[in-house]
Structure formats: structure tokens, C-alpha cells
Amino acid sequence: RITRQTLIDCGVDVPFFSANGSDIFKLTNGNLPDVWAGSDFKGDCAGELARMNAYQPQFPRYAAEFWAGCAQQWGGFFSRQSPESVADAYRKALESGIYVNFYMFCGGTNFGFQNGALESTYRVDKPGAPDRYIPYATSYDVDALVSESGQPTEKYYACKRVLAEYLHRPVDDSRITVPAQTTAPIALTETAPLLDQADALSTRTVASALPRTMESMGQAYGFLLYTTTLPHYDDRRYELDLHDVHDRALVFGNGAYLGTAMRDRPGAPIAFRIPPEGIRIDILVENLGRINYGYAMQYDRKGLLGAVRLRIQNPDGSYIWNYALVQNWENRSLPLTDLSALRFSTAPAAPQHPCFFRGAFAAQPGVDTFLDLHSGHKGCAWINGFPLGRYWSVGPQQTLYVPGDLLREQNELIVLELHPDGTPLTVQCIDHPILDSISHTIDLSEESGRA
């Protein structure tokens, strides 16, 4: 009621409606009685019609989200619906007198770091599986009627035929093709190690006893770099315990990669020994995307939310009874909204040391393309200073959409590769997307653990 009244007080004078889950509980508890209640569903038009008639017989029947596909989840399979099944459901909805708003009619892109996330289960998880953090991919193509790049799909033409038949109008079978281009391979010959240039990239550095969250640093997206130094205590084996990592942390000791920790996923211990001169610990935490649906939105802070502790192992394999708390941190904000401070060289990138790569390529201005990054493992890409988004070898997305309006005759490409393998990085722009390539299934636990 407060939300509606605020909109009215601000001069909004259009009809209001709500989008509700396909359950009578959600209809009755997620809406106001005098507000037009739309329903979100796919397929079961008869059941939805009965629920809508029972709840609001005085309003037109409205599919506020008529699902034609689903968003892509990193590490999960691309969920597709066939053109025939969507067109058949659309026909039944029209014949039932249901007004339809396709979700999505046209796919889109979560450029930069703007992808969302869920606290839920993967679509192939078994019933009763625990909820976990699931980030969405950069692409929001969602197998829509019109693709991420504006290309009408077979699903579009199938639904177009259904609508023409329902309206008793002739079917226009003409097709539209959105042009796309392929470039020559792009050699990224210049490098800039991230940890070496963190001070230049940082927008704010704060010293604190315990790690600060991204929000307390006044930062919304990107990365945080936490740094501390541990003196030499003894020669025992130490394990770093990161409590509440949000969302993915790369750990380094004196510049050497020690391991990765991921939110809600078990991993091998991040272990090390402290040399006589001591050890500098750097923890690079990536915000993988903010939860955009459900109660968990309000709790989704980013960074290291809890304490960092040391688990100490004795020579006989036992551990001391309590943990040692790690204090005295430097917290650096790395939103990566401005890369102009980077200083590149032609030195090779060190293996497992996050590094920016830069190269140049020629393209036809105004013509779309898709940046193929399957040669990398995980990172982000910028073309002519514009943040395209993330890539990740776990799939299913392997290309990033590049709108033609971003391109010039000569272009600069910068790629941040979080896990370089020590070899030169070469990528290419191709004329088609790769959005459903996945080499293994849902569990990302292999992404967490010790080097």
C-alpha cells in the first residue's frame, strides 16, 4: 500500500498491476485486492485460468510473465523450450482469453558486473537439495523470441503464426537477419598484473582491524582486495579459514597463488607455511552478482563478511584447539570502472596471477559481433573502455555480445584473466553466440580449494 501510494503521490497515474507466482498463496499474499494481479507461468493455461478466476473474477486474465525461456546460471545447463511447445502454450493462452506478456520477448545483456543471482537450487538439483548462492551469467538471452542481439528466432516466427491465425490475418513469412561479423584472431600481447597495480586502480583504501564489507567501503560492484602480513611464528602448517566469503576469493601468499574459496561450496584447505621473513596475505574477493529476488536480497552483502582465522596443525597431524584470529587489514576498493591508470608492458603473465591483457583489432563499425573467450578460464572484458561482462569456462556462456555501436575501425580490447596459465592469450570475435556449452555439470566445488 505504501509503495502504491508513493507512486500516486509522485504523479504516476497509469493502472497498476502485479506479477505473482503461480500459486493461490502467492496471489493472495503478494497483491492488493484492488490491484490487477498478473500471474507468472508457462504451459498450464487451464490451471492458471482457474486460479485467476477464483482470485479476481472482475479483472481480465493476464500472464504478467509468460515464460518463453529461463535465465542462464553459471555452471548450469542452458534451459531451453522448443518453439513448438511455446507456440502451443501461447495458442492455448489466447484461446482461454488470457492476455500474454512474454518474459522475455527480447533477450538482453547484463553488461559489466550487473548480472543478478539467486539463493536457490539448480534446475537439475534433486528435491530437498539445500539452497545455495547461484550467480547468473552475463547474457540474458534466456532463449527468448528475439535473441540478445535482436535476431528473431524460430520461436518468434512460430508465435507470430499463432497470433496471425488467432486474429484471422494472413501470415507474413518474411525473415529478418541481423548482420554479424568475424574478426581476425586478437593477440593480447601487453600485460598488467592486477596485484602489482592495485594501488593505482583502487578508489579507496582503508585500514581496519577486521575485513570491511564492500558496502561499508561505499562500493557496489567489482572486487575488494584485502591485505595483511603474518610474522613467522613457527614451522607448522597453517590453514586459512575464510568465514562467509561473498562471493569468490583468490588467496595469495607472498604473491604465490594459494587457492580459491567460493560461497556455499566446500573446498580443499588453503594451506601454507610461514617463512622466516613472514608472509604477506592478499585475498582478492569478487562480487559475482547481487541476489535480485526473494528474502535474501536484504542480507546479500559482499566481501569477507566474517572473520579470517588460522587453523594450526601440529607435526603429529592434530590441530590446536582454537583458531587464531587474523587482524590488521588493508582494504582496497577495486570497482574497475576506470582502467586508465593501468600501465602495460610486454612481460609475460605469471601463472595463476590475475592479470590484465591488452590488444588491438580491426572491425567494421556498426556491425555486431561476439567475443569468444573460451581460451581463458575466468575474468572480465572491456572493448574501447566499455565493460562487456564476465566470462567463465564452467559455462554455459562462452561468448560476450558486442553491439556494433561499440566498434570502431581500430579497437582496444582489455581482458582481466583471473587464472592465467603463463602462455599468451589470444581470443577472437565471431559472428554467432555460444551460450550453451558446458563441459561438466552443476557442482562448482572444483572451483574451490588449494593450488
Where in this protein do the model-derived segments appear?
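Short beta-strands within extracellular/lumenal beta-sheet-rich domains
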Residues: 220-231, 351-362, 398
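Compositionally biased low-complexity segments at domain edges in trafficked proteins
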Residues: 311-364, 443-451
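Catalytic cores of secreted or luminal carbohydrate-active enzymes
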Residues: 148-223, 286, 297-341
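Active-site neighborhood of glycoside hydrolase catalytic domains
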Residues: 1-32
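Glycine/proline-rich low-complexity spacer/linker segments in large multi-domain proteins
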Residues: 286-322, 420-451
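A cross-kingdom feature marking solvent-exposed beta-strand/loop segments within repeated
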Residues: 132-133, 152-155, 211-212, 216, ...
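Aromatic-lined ligand-binding clefts that engage carbohydrates, nucleic acids, or primary amines
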Residues: 236-252, 281, 361-384, 391-392, ...
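Catalytic-core region of carbohydrate-active enzymes that cleave or remodel glycosidic bonds
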Residues: 10, 40-147, 151, 162
